[in-house]
Structure formats: structure tokens, C-alpha cells
Amino acid sequence: MKLFQTYYYLRNMTIDLLPLLRCPVTKSPLKLEVISTGKKLYGNQETEIISKAILYAEEDWFYPVVDGIPRLLVESFIDHSSFLKTHLPDYTQRSQILFLKYKDLLQHVIKKNTRTKKSFEHEWRLFDYEKDKTWNADEKQMMERFLKETGETIESLSSKRIFDVGCGNGLLDKLIAAQGATILGMDISNSIEKAFHKNTDPGALFIQGDIQFPPVNSGYFDIVHCSGVLIHTNSTKQSFFCVESCVRENGKLSVWLYHPRKDWIHNMILQVRKFTSKLPLIIQYYLYKLIFLPPLFLIKWLKGQKPQRRELMLALMDQFSPEFRWEHEPEEVKSWFNIKNYGNIKITTRELFGYNMTGIKKQEE
């Protein structure tokens, strides 16, 4: 039996999911207190799910399950204070303990995450699941890209345990699950809600979490895939070291990152970003829509393409809105793989703006 195949099946949740999840701070196992259940359609089968619950660490920390999704950010008890005040009688006392004992940690995560969460939530809110492509790729192209980046095949995915760190709209997770893999998608923003609600494959599972505080058991996954996410955190290197801990021995880590470019247009974009990324999101939205979008749409149209305005807006938001955007030479990233005892390190794809690199985690001697 796959450890967490029936993640949201009520009858198996305590058996299959809880051994995988961990408190992101203490790494202790979590205990579940169910508040209410609901229904979700997987394929043609309506399944009972846990829609509201609270997860308790062995000491101090507690995390809500809201709308069927475990909210496992360090600061989730703040983000979902209204929910917790309603369902946890001693919420005030518990939260005061956390503020007193972990003041510096909480200040750190709030500072580094607040703008990033809002930026990517706003970005993916633009995505139309019925009409839009994901980064100009349809479902077939998305799957082909994933296989090329990871060096896997359709056949090799069967029964694999995969962690998609920064899953965005969640469409790729659904496609991978359809090949017989069990995949856990994690995202830092509330975009995870649409990913979960639009998913119809029971093998694709979703949690909200922070790449620098992964709320899962260490050394568990066959493949950890992190595409275009590390470079949007406050420290690419630190995030790399945090996420690689989730890879099992002989497992694979796959990361996609930006590389430096030496052309004046790219450098101009980076300079513009220094200004736009600091603006309120609502101002950014109209700036891109009214000033940046029309010429970009015209350029695409003159090239014979058929651009969708929402897709172009999403691309503009991804380029100019995130607080952090780092670029790294392949040799630098390769050194991180080496530090963490990975072998068979190779670049699997090279593109205009970035590249994908994979490595196999060696067994400890």
C-alpha cells in the first residue's frame, strides 16, 4: 500500500497521511482532531474527506486543516486565527505561548513570506483552468517537459512517491498521478485551494507549506521536483538545502533555476523589477495590464502567435511581481548538490531564461 495514496479518504487518513506529515518547526509527528467532514469527487466516485480539523505537534505548535487542506506554514496559526478561535477554545493561550517562545522565528517567516504569498496567490488567481495553458504549454506539453526535466519516463513514474514543491495551479500533479504515481503538491500561497478543488485524481494530494520549513518526513520521496521556485525565495541556496532533505537515499532531486543573461533587454527588465516588485499588488496589476500588456500582445500577434491576455498577464506577474528573483550559474548549483552528497549530477534542459538540473542522492557510508 502506498503510504499516503488515500490522503483525503477519511477511513485511512490517520493510517496513511499522519506518518508522513511533520511539524515544520520541531519535525515531530502530528496528531489529528477532526472537526467536520465533507464530500469530494474523484473521477466518478464521491469520497468522504476531512474538511476541517486541527493538527497538533508534540509540543506547542498546532495547524488547521481548512477546506480539506492542511495549512502547515509556521505562521498558519496567525493566518487562520478566525478559524482557530472558533474551533479551539484555548487558542489565545496557545498562540501567546508561540509568540513568547518563538518571537524571532515568527518575525522571520512573516517578513520573508507575506509578500510572496500575496504575489503568487494573485498571480494564479488569473489562471482559467478551462481556457488557459500553463506557461504556454498544454497538458501533453506539460507532461513532456516534466519527463525531460526529471529524466523519467511514463513507465518509470508508476508507484513513485513524488514531492512537487511549489505546485502552482496543480495541473501537473493531476497529470503525474494519472500515470500511477502518488504526488504531494505543496505551495506557499492560497492558490493551493484552487489546485485542490480542481483536482479529480486521488493520487494527487495537496498541502500548504514553506519550502524552507518542509512539513513532511525527511528522506521519504523518490523524486523531489522544484521548478522555478527556489529562485523566488529569500535564499536559493538555503531553500535548496531545506528541500533536498526530503529526498530518500538513491532518490532524485530536480530543480529549475534562472541563469544570468548578458543582454541589455534582460538587464533593463531586472532594473524595472526593482521598482515594480515593491508596489502594492493592485497598482502592479493595472500597471502591467494598461502599460506592459498591450505592446507584449502586439509583439506576439505580429509573430503569428495567438496570445491569450490572461496568460500574458500571468507571465508579466511572474516576471515583475515576486519580491525575490535570483539567477545562478550551473557550476554554483552543482556545488550544492556535491555538498549534500549527490551523484550523477547533470543539466537535463537548457532554455532561454534557465535550466533544469538533477542529481541522485548517494547512500550514506
What label would you give each PLM region?
Residues 263-271, 305-325:
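Short, glycine-/aromatic-enriched active-site segment of Class I SAM-dependent methyltransferases
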Residues 250-258:
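Conserved beta-strand signature within the Rossmann-like core of class I S-adenosyl-L-methionine
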Residues 266-300:
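Conserved Class I S-adenosyl-L-methionine
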Residues 343-347:
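A short linear hydrophobic-aromatic micro-motif
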